[in-house]
Amino acid sequence: MRRTNLASCLFVLVSATAGAQDPAVTDPDRYKVILENEHTRVLDYKDHPGDRTTQHKHPDSVLYALSPFKRKLTFPDGKSVIKAFNPGDVMFIPAQTHIGENIGKTDTHVLLVEFKKPPPSAKPVNP
């Protein structure tokens, strides 16, 4: 009984921590889920110059820029990268945890397509 309760508590704690890093949860004023199914989730992200997100994580994703913007991403190890985008830019982003900051003079507006991993039992489809 004691072992079951401990396992249940750990599961809840881990689940809460994992959910807390979902950008739609950590920054709901900026990230809007516009489509979600078993394969993908599409997020509409908007912010203003000087805005900074809470630390969050994304699975493998594709970013599509709808506006020009300049952004700083800071990773958990303290390293950071600065990227500038123009409307129509498309970029693959490997799974990562970061804090995002709009360091430019224009609003950010992007669509993020997040890829969900197939279940372990999924069989590849032949082309």
Regions found by a protein language model. Give the residues of each.
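Bacterial N-terminal signal peptides
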Residues: 7-16
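Short acidic-glycine-tyrosine-enriched beta hairpin
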Residues: 78-95
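Positively charged n-region of N-terminal signal peptides that target proteins for export
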Residues: 1-4
